[in-house]
């Protein structure tokens, strides 16, 4: 009977060791959950960026307004018959 108790105690210690310090331990599981949360947040940010870029590509492919806006902002494009006004703020 004493021998069975020793064997069962040893098996329990082995199971507890793998639970607390092994490859699939509780600490590692917690660390992986934190990494997953961080990665999901990054993925969500990138998905929003991708959606925005896809909408911009669609506008560039299907409409002239996006092209005109980019030309105005980045290149200073002014169409015929338009008047350009530049407003300058004075910091006082």
Swiss-Prot record:
UniProt key word Cell cycle: yes
Residues exposed to the Cytoplasmic side: 1-3
Periplasmic side stretches: 22-92
GO biological process: FtsZ-dependent cytokinesis
Topology in membrane: Single-pass type II membrane protein
Any Pfam family: DivIC
Protein localization: Cell inner membrane
Family of the protein in this entry: Belongs to the FtsB family.
Subunit and interaction comment: Part of a complex composed of FtsB, FtsL and FtsQ.
Name of this protein: Cell division protein FtsB
Native organism: Neisseria meningitidis serogroup B (strain ATCC BAA-335 / MC58)
Gene (name only): ftsB
């Amino acid at each position: 009977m004493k021998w069975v108790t020793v064997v069962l105690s040893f098996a329990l210690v082995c199971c507890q060791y793998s639970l607390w310090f092994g490859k699939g331990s509780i600490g590692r599981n917690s660390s992986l959950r934190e990494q997953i949360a961080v990665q999901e947040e990054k993925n969500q940010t990138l998905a929003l960026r991708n959606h925005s870029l896809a909408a911009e590509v669609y506008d560039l492919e299907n409409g002239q307004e996006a092209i005109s806006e980019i030309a105005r902002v980045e290149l200073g494009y002014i169409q015929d018959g338009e008047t350009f006004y530049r407003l300058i703020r004075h910091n006082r």
